[in-house]
């Protein structure tokens, strides 16, 4: 047999560079694919865990910022004001032309109402009521709601003070509130200023809308300065109660004490009717007791005349 041919070293040297270059190219491609896969996985992980990672970073930075702020405040410490203060008064009132209801602050914490209840409406002027009869048709009711909302304190420690404030409203009393009208001296020619007070601490100043002018006969008697008979006649004419003009309504809340612990209601028409009667009596008394000038001022006219209305009517 012929001798087997031995591989030549030239052929081996010719084929080795090609095989090495192919292997290097394949390895580089695999490395590139692996790198792309790793980047994709990393992006997916960051996307899934971004919320938790953001919360963790926020907590870490907040702790660091609080520590730095405490270090800055530590050299100059200032006394902090006491947190325990009087609670804010919470009132809700609804007004219309006939009735008014005042509600005390609630004892329990309620949820915040919608934005519609927070809108403050402008109050509409009340329509004048010149009718004396209660049987007639009432005027149009113009409602106006007023509300003021703010947060309640967590520790409602001052609730007792608010309850003490509302305690007189809920007491059961049978005696009606006494009304007092006081005359105050003013310059001649100007209407008298009347002050009406009640046991509830309400005050109202009433001015006559159209005060009756003195008759020319009385002025002539005063200027002429006649005898005693003429003076007596003028005084009688002056003391005669003249019919006062129809006065407009006055908003004087006369709140009766009723057996109600939550709400207190009053009738505005009844208050206006009573006020008209009182103003008529005041006009009559003002004619009977005029304000005299400096030299002729009597000792009795210097004092304030006190008139108490009859509650038996």
Curated annotation (Swiss-Prot):
Residue ranges, compositional bias (Basic residues): 107-122
Tell me a GO biological process for this protein. Answer: sperm individualization
Coiled-coil stretches are: 263-289
Renumbered to this chain, the Polar residues biased-composition regions fall at 76-85
Membrane spanning stretches: 29-49
Any Pfam family the entry gives? Spem1
Q: Basic and acidic residues compositional bias: what residue ranges?
A: 300-313
Q: What coarse category fits the chief subcellular location reported for this protein?
A: membrane
Annotated localization: Membrane; Cytoplasm
What domain of life? Eukaryota
What is the protein's known function? Required for proper cytoplasm removal during spermatogenesis.
Name of this chain's protein = Spermatid maturation protein 1
The encoding gene is: SPEM1
